[in-house]
Amino acid sequence: GVDTAIWDLRGRLSEKSVAELLGGSPGSIRAYGSSMRRDITPYDEAIRLKSLRDSQGFDAFKVRAGAEVGRNQDEWPGRTEEIIPTMRKELGLDVELLIDANSCYSPKRAIEVGHILEDNNFCHFEEPCPYWELEQTKIVTDALKIDVTGGEQDCDLPTWRKMIEMRAVDIVQPDILYLGGISRTMRVVEMANKADLPVTPHCANLSLVTVFTMHLLRAIEGAGKYLEFSIEGPEYYPWQTDLFSNDP
């Protein structure tokens, strides 16, 4: 909070955006629609995402696999095996598809799910194994062609250094607020740039973290393809209402 507030103050005093202070410029950013829900059937999720594609212009979406820190258990039996082909069938080949396992799987199970994802042209497999088990995640990364991603939970810079040096993931996902602000996030960005790893920050709700991430993505080298943009409204995150003059 303090770090991002200081960056905001610097921008106000200099009459520049934080993106400019970081060496970038204001402008457009491609966003993917990020679903947070596991309590929804694959077909109903597909209908929801198709509506957003048609009404809001999203051309990429992320859905959920497994149960959160689920020890190989699904939200209900068979949901993961159903949601992957259902998303591709219903949304077509023109939409990029991402998926988040939220630390659900052992390496063996993650690789099995990863092959299903590859068969259905998904492009991003997030946090397949318990996030603190970097060696497990690296096994999955090395076994699959799909991009394996992670890092949202990590706030310890030595852990980031280890993750990047061992190439535990293909894409790093720092969360500006979990990590402690713009300044510490830029240190992770520098590490990732040296290792030639893209940076696609985590920002899973429509709080100020999304605003901060917009500025970051417009400024950094090695920025990933997307801004994560939550599609969940007040029924899921009631505290989001009226945070801004104009709700996103």
Segments from the language model and where they lie:
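N-terminal capping/lid subdomain adjacent to the active-site entrance of alpha/beta enzymes
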Residues: 1-98, 102-111, 115-119, 239-248
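Conserved, mostly hydrophobic/aromatic
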Residues: 2, 15, 61, 100, ...
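Short alpha-helical "patches" and their helix-cap loops
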Residues: 16-27, 125, 224-236
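Flexible, glycine/charged-enriched surface loops at secondary-structure junctions
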Residues: 18-21, 64, 127-131, 203
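Active-site-adjacent beta->alpha loops and helix N-cap segments on the catalytic face
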Residues: 21-23, 69-87, 106-109, 128-142, ...
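Hydrophobic faces of well-ordered beta-strands that scaffold small-molecule active sites
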Residues: 31-34, 59-63, 95-101, 125-126, ...
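Residue-level marker of alpha-helix boundaries and capping positions
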Residues: 39-40, 78, 104, 127-128, ...
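Shared catalytic-loop signature of beta/alpha-barrel
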Residues: 115, 121, 132-248
